[in-house]
C-alpha cells in the first residue's frame, strides 16, 4: 500500500511473532507490545477482552504512525479495543493480521486470508522446550 509505520505493536501473545516478522520484512526496528487477555481456551473467551500489565506507554506514541499486529481477527473485540486505545494518542493507527474471520466486528487494514476455521499456529500449539531440554505443552 506504500504506508509504513514508525512503530509496530504486537498484541501478546498471538501477535508477537507476526509483529516481529513484519518488522524485519519492512525494516521497522521500533517495536512494542500490548498484553490482552480474551481467549481462555479453544473457543472460550471472557465476556470482553482486558488489557493486562505491564501496559504499553501510550504517551510515547504521540506523533507516530502505528501498526497493530495480531494473528487473527476472530471476534474482532481485541483489535477493536487496542486500535481505539492507541488512536487516543498516536497520529495514525492501522492493523494487520494473518487471518480474518467472517464474523469479526473489526475489519483490519491488512489481512492475508479469510477463513471460518480454527487456526493452529506453530507458536501456540507445539510443545515448549524448557531450559532443561524437556517439553511442556504450550498454553
Feature map (PLM): residue ranges:
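PRPP-associated nucleotide enzymes
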Residues: 1-139
Amino acid at each position: 500500500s506504500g504506508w509504513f509505520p514508525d512503530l509496530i505493536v504486537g498484541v501478546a501473545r498471538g501477535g508477537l511473532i507476526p509483529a516481529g516478522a513484519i518488522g524485519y520484512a519492512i525494516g521497522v526496528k521500533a517495536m512494542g507490545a500490548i498484553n490482552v487477555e480474551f481467549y481462555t481456551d479453544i473457543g472460550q473467551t471472557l465476556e470482553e477482552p482486558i488489557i493486562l500489565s505491564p501496559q504499553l506507554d501510550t504517551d510515547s506514541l504521540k506523533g507516530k504512525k502505528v501498526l497493530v499486529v495480531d494473528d487473527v481477527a476472530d471476534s474482532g473485540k481485541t483489535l477493536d479495543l487496542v486500535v481505539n486505545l492507541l488512536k487516543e494518542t498516536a497520529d495514525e493507527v492501522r492493523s494487520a493480521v494473518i487471518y480474518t474471520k467472517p464474523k469479526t466486528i473489526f475489519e483490519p487494514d491488512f489481512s492475508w486470508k479469510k477463513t471460518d476455521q480454527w487456526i493452529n499456529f506453530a507458536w501456540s500449539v507445539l510443545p515448549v522446550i524448557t531450559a532443561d531440554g524437556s517439553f511442556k505443552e504450550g498454553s
